[in-house]
Amino acid sequence: MKLKWRGLQFEHYILGILLAVEWIMSFTFLGYIHIPPISITTAHIPIVVIACLFGPVESSVAGLFFGLGSMYKASALYVMLGDRIFSPFQTDFPIGSILLSVGTRVLFGFLMGCIFKIVNKSRYKWAGKSLAALIATPLHALLVYGAMGILFPESGFNYKSSFRWGVNDYAIAAICILAVILSDIIYHSSFVTHYKNVINDSELRQHWSVKMKMSLFIIIIFVFCIAAFSTIYFASRTEYMFGVYGVKVTKKIAQDILHLQVQFLAAMISLNFILIVIILMIYNYMKHREYMGEMDALTNVMGRRLFLNYCTKCQNDRDDIDNK
């Protein structure tokens, strides 16, 4: 699905939510099953959904999110031995770790986007999408294990490891297929299509002045700084608490405590981002209802107040164009 992103507010919202979901899964139990010697991941599923709904560029960005999250999570000292090679800070081949954790996930997102792009042009879309979702999990495993065999042969994993499936692998593949099919059905339903047209209606977009944008930017930076300082504070208090109970906190343990706090912060920021986006979507829909209520029922012509607001918006848009 090729998108011209300018003016597609609804698509921005949905992609933002899915990227936030990817970020949450990359840092929480939702994205990993910790079974020695190496964790099994489900965090590739949002990438497949994005590939189905949008395209290779967007799914590659989602792959980048997954890769960066995986690389950060593997940088902790408490992770399993098999997971440590995903971090450039825990191996003697840092470039190889970056290629393994980030490169393979970006490539996976790109390939899935290309596959769904071909499928969306075919006559048998549903069968094609189901098949694409089915091969997503083994394709991700093949890319990751294949890269491990090339970059880190001493790990004992190679492309053959991707064919050793257990119950968890079949369950993840089934969840991936279900997620893609349900997402596609909901996204292209008549209700969502109507809602999308409402959100993307240029007549309903609010004008944001430069001062308003700057104020919002300052507030976001301020809140983020407070959250970051709070993370450091709670990590420090956790160390203090262990000391009170007689547990000696070494430098490595202190690093892992802070590492976990940062993961928690990233997940909470993502959850709040999703909440804000949903509130914006509801607000825009309510503005649409207000807009339709101001229209004359017989003539379908703007009322006086709506017409004046529309003129003000047009003038503001013209001023923005002149300033550019």
Residue positions per predicted region:
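Hydrophobic transmembrane alpha-helices
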Residues: 1-62
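Active-site-proximal structural segments of metal-dependent nucleotidyl cyclase/transferase enzymes
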Residues: 310-324
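Conserved nucleotide-binding and Mg2+-coordinating catalytic segments in signaling enzymes
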Residues: 290-312
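Alpha-helical transmembrane segments and their helix-entry boundary regions
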Residues: 58-63, 129, 133
